[in-house]
């Protein structure tokens, strides 16, 4: 059996190069790493990549990122890219592929024009974007985590994130602008198909009228919608092997807002909304928190995610579900008795539920994710609620002091006690004695900033102080200091008023008395000053 080997080959843009070995029964690739002596050795961490002869469909040769690459299309395992060949290896590869597997290696040229408009082709295992009939790039269906129709002419693709969680630059989303509309004809139109079946049962009467009706009932869809539907079908978005463990219908989410059907599988769940769909791996769930809203009508289930869900530039590190407190739901797990006993009985799950909605959903989430369900602790407001009404910047909501964390809703902000350096109670811009509210500032460690919660009722001050002190968090009470300073200032003013009263002028000293230097003038003098006819008047009197 002849063997052909190539060194320095990279599989699917891997960081580690390896050795490609080709024999008559198939081919295999194994990663290698450099040793301290400058040689190389096979790694134990990475398993070899093997392809049997029966899996190979086609092969293509083109330029790659590390020289030249050979892409192999398979029947069931997508496309495999082997990068790092020299140009001189082409003839040898052609001979080996033809002799061992009966496959011809086709040469392809990639488009390097840099245009961002072109045509898309849905091939067997990848989406190909072509410019001037040359492929510009390919997107393997396996790399598409989710897709959403944004508006009428835009389709967004979200890509799988690295499993190792490494930091660095990563392409997370791509959007395609797909203009125009398309008429759906023939069997593609479900309305026409149903009508045709009905006419077949009733006979062939009125065929001419039926044909006219069919032409008028052609459905017009946007090209973006057809692109989106085709991508979902090809990439199997939303389609998984097996049946959901449990399905929850019409669950109302405050964040992201809308009603979603939640299908929960063994290792992940899917949220299917009217516009957007999301997939959440259970390993990304960090916390589960169940809280009663102070309105005495609703309960909330908060699911903290890391990494967060993405929708364009918007991130959702929290899922917030809201339930009516009196609402009840009835669900059953889609597993038989044997499977339940083997996989789910030890996780605290039950085969059927008929309880309050928030209790059922919380219990199912706890069992499948393996996360502890956090509930309110010992803190209560003066009205017996678990949350204090306040504001964070422009957002109004409630601050929930939990046993190890603070949680602010409606826009979630999660603050562990371990990250808090100190807490300051203060009131800015108002008199301490007349103010009915105060502010609470949480300063974080390592200069991570601070959170200022304002407009907290003064009735809650005593309870919050006692809670903060019980958790061993450093507390600064500027309200007490300001009140003490104000009292001292008022005391000084009272002392000054008692000692200095005799030195102040009295209003009694300003009694009215005639001015001795003032002599009242006669009426004639007044007339001479203000009356222009004063002289003539006096003259007339003399004549008389």
Curated annotation (Swiss-Prot):
Q: Which SMART domains match?
A: Rtt106
Q: Where is the composition biased (Acidic residues)?
A: 204-219, 523-544
User: In which residue ranges is the amino acid composition biased (Basic and acidic residues)?
Assistant: 188-203
Instruction: Record the organism.
Output: Yarrowia lipolytica (strain CLIB 122 / E 150) (Yeast)
> Function, please?
Component of the FACT complex, a general chromatin factor that acts to reorganize nucleosomes. The FACT complex is involved in multiple processes that require DNA as a template such as mRNA elongation, DNA replication and DNA repair. During transcription elongation the FACT complex acts as a histone chaperone that both destabilizes and restores nucleosomal structure.
Name of the protein in question:
FACT complex subunit POB3
Taxonomic superkingdom: Eukaryota
Compartment(s) where it occurs, according to its Swiss-Prot or TrEMBL record: Nucleus; Chromosome
Please give the subunit comment from the record: Forms a stable heterodimer with SPT16. The SPT16-POB3 dimer weakly associates with multiple molecules of NHP6 to form the FACT complex.
Q: Which family does it belong to?
A: Belongs to the SSRP1 family.
